[in-house]
Amino acid sequence: MRIQSLLLLGALLAVGSQLPAVFGRKKGEKWGGCPADDGPCLLSVPDQCVEDSQCPLTRKCCYRACFRQCVPRVSVKPGSCPQDQLRCLSPMNHLCHKDSDCSGKKRCCHSACGRDCRDPARG
C-alpha cells in the first residue's frame, strides 16, 4: 500500500508540474515574448507567419514593422504593465527595450513618451 501511495504521489507531481506549461499558453504558443516593435510602417508586406508553431526552434511569430514575422523571442518577467493615461508632447524617448534591461521585478513598459522600467501593475 505504501509503495502504491508513493507511486501515485510521484505521478501526480509529474502531471501537476506540466499544468502551467499547458494551461498558461495557447496551443502552439512558445515561451517568451516579442521584442519591441519600433519599426516604421513603410509598405504593406504579407505576413510571414500567423502563429508561433510556424517559426523554427526558439523564434516567435511577432509584429515587426507592420507585418508578422519569425523573430528571436525575448524573456518576459511576470506581471503586466500599468496603463498610462497621459499624452506626450515631446519626442519619444526609450529608456529600455526589453524586460531584461530593467532591474529586479521591473518591466519595460510603454509610457506616454516611450518605454521605461516600471513596477508591474497589481491585481
From Swiss-Prot:
Pfam families: WAP (PF00095). The keyword Transcription does not apply. One of its GO terms (cellular component) is extracellular space. GO terms for molecular function: serine-type endopeptidase inhibitor activity. One of its GO terms (biological process) is innate immune response. Its main location: secreted. Putative acid-stable proteinase inhibitor. This is WAP four-disulfide core domain protein 5. The gene is WFDC5.
